[in-house]
Amino acid sequence: MVHIMFNQAAQELTTIRDVLRFAVSRFNEAGLFFGHGTDNAHDEAAYLILHTLNLPLDMLAPYLDAKLLEAEKEEVLTVIERRAVEHIPAAYLTHQAWQGEFDFYVDERVIIPRSFIYELLGDGLRPWIEYDELVHNALDLCTGSGCLAIQMAHHYPDAQIDAVDVSLDALEVAGINVEDYGLEERIRLIHTDLFEGLEGTYDLIVSNPPYVDAESVELLPEEYLHEPELALGSGADGLDATRQILLNAAKFLNPKGVLLVEIGHNRDVLEAAYPELPFTWLETSGGDGFVFLLTREQLLGEE
């Protein structure tokens, strides 16, 4: 049911400033969760309004007092109401998600890009990968939208990249993004479950696998219910996929190869399960407990 305030707003709101204020109030009233691109009601509302009106996303102030046409107002308020009532993440409403300077097409076939791994590509992996030109073959496990594979292609200009996912739906979305960036000759999309059926070895393997434990899956905010469950949950402790990666990665790494994996809030659980592995935890904007690095030698117990 459309919220009763929608019709009132359509009649009484005039400017972008009016609609922005209304949207912030509406989002706060609805108790929305923010974390798929913005972290507060104001920024979320501003993004949705600017995107819907085809205005620059970084130029809200000059347009605040601009009056809206009736058709524009209806379109913007419809988006605001869908966000408030259905708890659909903004990225699914706009079909656009950002990571750094890169933007990607997304829909409900893939999770919304939010991995910290992209921050580490290039300079963040020194000294393990001393020069970007040393990466000739790379692998992105659980590629989803293809965002990390595309950013690897940017940071490692000489690399050929395999991007793997068990979901054909996800690979269709990844294909859209790979084509948008003109990387069809450098990124190969592969339908398989982690390493199954892969051949060859890689200088760099990255993965943002499912890592939410069973109990936490049940407690996720409503917004997460719009994301594919396959890409979120990973067994009782959240480590099912990570265990398979740790078990098999060494066989697919070159002698100086590096494994980079994001595991959410599972650092303590992982270290307790693998006390013999010398995990290096890399600093990201989220802290130093989300992404670990292991070399091939460390995985084999040779270092």
Swiss-Prot record:
Its EC number is 2.1.1.298. One of its GO terms (molecular function) is protein-glutamine N-methyltransferase activity. Keywords: Methyltransferase, S-adenosyl-L-methionine, Transferase. GO terms for cellular component: cytosol. It catalyses: L-glutaminyl-[ribosomal protein uL3] + S-adenosyl-L-methionine = N(5)-methyl-L-glutaminyl-[ribosomal protein uL3] + S-adenosyl-L-homocysteine + H(+). InterPro entries: DNA_methylase_N6_adenine_CS, HemK-like, Ribosome_uL3_MTase, SAM-dependent_MTases_sf, Small_mtfrase_dom. One of its GO terms (biological process) is methylation. The keyword Ribosomal protein does not apply. Methylates large ribosomal subunit protein uL3 on a specific glutamine residue. Belongs to the protein N5-glutamine methyltransferase family. PrmB subfamily. This is Ribosomal protein uL3 glutamine methyltransferase. It comes from Neisseria meningitidis serogroup A / serotype 4A (strain DSM 15465 / Z2491).
